[in-house]
């Protein structure tokens, strides 16, 4: 699945449920982080002119609420057909923003990081987890230029030594060794797929002997505090009849010395409204 908010629409699509946190959820969490850590922020939003980018802008405004027009000093969209987005970054720097929300796909996210370094523009920089690949984004942009960029995550990184003694990660590793020997454990899709499959197993367990389409869907919408082995500790899966968004929590992370480091508490996307 993608992070499109359309996956969480039980009224119009009662048989469809995504898995990963939606773009709107991640944007809400970024907005909460900004309000807590930089309450007088002047935010520049750089986003793709498509559903992905627009979902993000909506999520930011969900949390900023009535203050959105004063907090967000610039909204700049780009087309995915553009060869370079440098002119957009120059324009956004000129707004005097001290927070930059980078809602760009990998190619353009890397361009943004690189151009910001050239301009010596150093706002608080929050970047969508769509573009957190070290190989596809941070290295092409320059590791030094990428230093300090913020994002948020929900999955453990199998290649990160901090999880080597983690019980959940040990189960994942033994599964991969048994069924996929030689697989590249640094591929985040393996960790993601394992968590999604483990959640599906939980749904089937809850379904018991009643494996009708209706009951399986009912159980998928009745998950309570399920913790898959490869989710970051503290992040739980919860669904309901009117809530088809399994993961609505993230943990902030910072790019430091060539790798992502988790920090702070788990942040929920709940807005209370």
Regions found by a protein language model. Name each.
Residues 178-191, 201-260:
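Segments of small-molecule ligand-sensing domains
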Residues 13, 116-192, 266-270:
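Extracellular/periplasmic periplasmic-binding protein-like sensory domains
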Residues 26-29, 77-91:
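Structural motif
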Residues 26, 56, 108, 168, ...:
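Catalytic-loop motifs flanking and including active-site residues across diverse enzymes
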Residues 35-40, 61-69, 90-97, 114-121, ...:
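Sec-exported extracytoplasmic/periplasmic mature domains
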Residues 1, 42-47, 96-106, 112, ...:
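Periplasmic-binding protein-like
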Residues 1-76, 125-151:
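Extracytoplasmic ligand/sensor domains, especially the bilobed periplasmic-binding protein
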């Amino acid at each position: 699945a993608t992070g499109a908010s359309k996956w969480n629409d039980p009224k119009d699509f009662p048989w469809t449920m995504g898995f990963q946190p939606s773009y709107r959820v991640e944007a809400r969490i970024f907005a909460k982080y900004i309000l807590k850590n930089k309450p007088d922020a002047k935010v520049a939003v750089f986003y793709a002119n498509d559903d992905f980018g627009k979902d993000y802008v909506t999520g930011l405004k969900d949390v900023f609420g009535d203050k959105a027009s004063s907090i967000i000093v610039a909204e700049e969209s780009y087309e995915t057909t553009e060869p370079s987005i440098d002119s957009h970054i120059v324009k956004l720097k000129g707004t005097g923003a001290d927070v930059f929300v980078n809602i760009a796909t990998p190619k353009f996210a890397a361009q943004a990081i690189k151009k910001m370094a050239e301009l010596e523009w150093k706002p608080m920089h929050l970047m969508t987890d769509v573009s957190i690949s070290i190989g596809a984004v941070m290295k092409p942009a320059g590791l030094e230029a990428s230093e300090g960029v913020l994002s948020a995550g929900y999955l453990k990184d199998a290649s990160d030594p901090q999880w080597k003694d983690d019980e959940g990660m040990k189960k994942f590793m033994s599964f991969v060794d048994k069924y996929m020997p030689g697989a590249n454990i640094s591929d985040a899709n393996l960790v993601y797929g394992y968590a999604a499959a483990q959640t599906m197993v939980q749904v089937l367990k809850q379904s018991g002997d009643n494996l009708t389409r209706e009951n399986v869907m009912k159980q998928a919408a009745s998950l309570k505090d399920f913790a898959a082995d490869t989710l970051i500790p503290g992040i739980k899966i919860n669904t309901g009849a009117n809530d088809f968004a399994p993961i609505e929590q993230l943990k902030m992370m910072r790019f430091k010395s060539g790798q992502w480091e988790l920090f702070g508490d788990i942040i929920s996307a709940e807005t209370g409204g």
